[in-house]
Amino acid sequence: MTDRPRGGMTALCLAQITSWGLLFYSLPVAVVPVSADTGWSHTTVTAALAAGLLVSAVLGVRVGRLLDVRGPRALMTTGSVIGVLALLLVAWSPNLPMFFAAWLLAGFAQSAVLYPPAFAVITRWYGPWRVGPLTTLTLVGGFASTVFAPLVAFLVEVFGWRGSYLVMAVILALVTIPLHALFLNGPWSDGAPVRATTAATAEIRQVTRSARFRILQITMAVATFTLFAVTINIIPMFLERGMSYEMAALSLGLVGAGQVIGRIGYPQFARATTPRMRTVTVFIAGAAALWVLALLPQPYWLLVAVAILAGGVRGCHTLLQATAVSDRWGTKNFGAINGAFVAPMTAVGAVALVAGPGLAELLGGYPAMAVIMAALLTGAALVAMREPQPRPAPHP
């Protein structure tokens, strides 16, 4: 654990909600007007965001190593600057290749300013007391779509999609650059200097190349993919069940409410369980929810209730992912190890944006797609049950 700068936690929370709102949620909100203006399909526009997320996943390991050695101030400030440039390029994109290039550049920014680096900072700042602050950060970040979806929609209505991205670039610059530059300036030391040496690299590889690490990584990635692919497509799936559009849209909003509830309850859940028990419980609850959503056509009230449960599982899963490495291997070299750990989750989250609708079309409907996802998550739960009990994680 290292000394925390005054205002650092508040700055991280404000920067996270703004960065998520503008570098991630803005495009799903703007996809219809972008498509209507350019003639690019909705899938193509969404694929640009997915491509950026893949870049973020690839860069995650390198970003984690830099964070361990250099600290967050310069890294996250630079990420914000790159994000501003990316949004400006989105606004000025004259063609599809340039539009994709803009979102690929946004992927560089995402790798430096979204959850993984913020989780690493909080883990270093708070050490054994990290779960509460991590919960707070994800609760605030969880409201990014609530705050920025209507704001982006308003900006698009007033300025058009290109003008709105110019305004968003200004907002990102005015909010996140000062927060990262001025409030992440505390000492970055836990009493023992970080060793960017052969010895430190060997320690990192010993963890990241272990069977236990890779099995946990794969099962967590499966959970990320399946839960996201189903819940993000709640509206078309419920429409296929005969539900009204208004109720289906409300159900998607309630998935978000479920995420908040899950995150609020996670600290107590964590105190009462072991890392393996938490993982298995979250996976089983998620699989059960997906099976019900896949196989039960009615009653609608039950489908909505299960959608909320699925949201709660996603909320818990976010914090489960944030603490998986530190709970098992401690906080030494956390940035590098966690960067390697979450890279597949970031990648499959990007793929799920387009894989869900694609599988639904291939299989003949969203319920059939949900069956596949439920089966995959069930398998992940069975594998997670076999994880050996970890040794107590050393305190930093």
At which residue positions do the language-model features occur?
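Helix-loop-helix hairpin linking two adjacent transmembrane segments in secondary transporters
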Residues: 137-188
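Cytoplasmic helix-loop-helix junction between adjacent transmembrane helices
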Residues: 103-139, 330
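Helix-to-loop junctions at the C-terminal end of transmembrane segments
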Residues: 58-71, 262-275, 360-361
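C-terminal transmembrane helical hairpin of 12-TM major facilitator-type secondary transporters
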Residues: 255, 259, 265, 272-324
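A late C-terminal transmembrane helix in Major Facilitator Superfamily
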Residues: 328-363
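Conserved MFS/SLC helix-loop-helix module at the cytosolic interface between two early adjacent transmembrane helices
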Residues: 58-96
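Extracytoplasmic gate region of multi-pass secondary transporters
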Residues: 27-31, 210-264
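Extracytoplasmic
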Residues: 8-42, 60-63, 149, 230-235
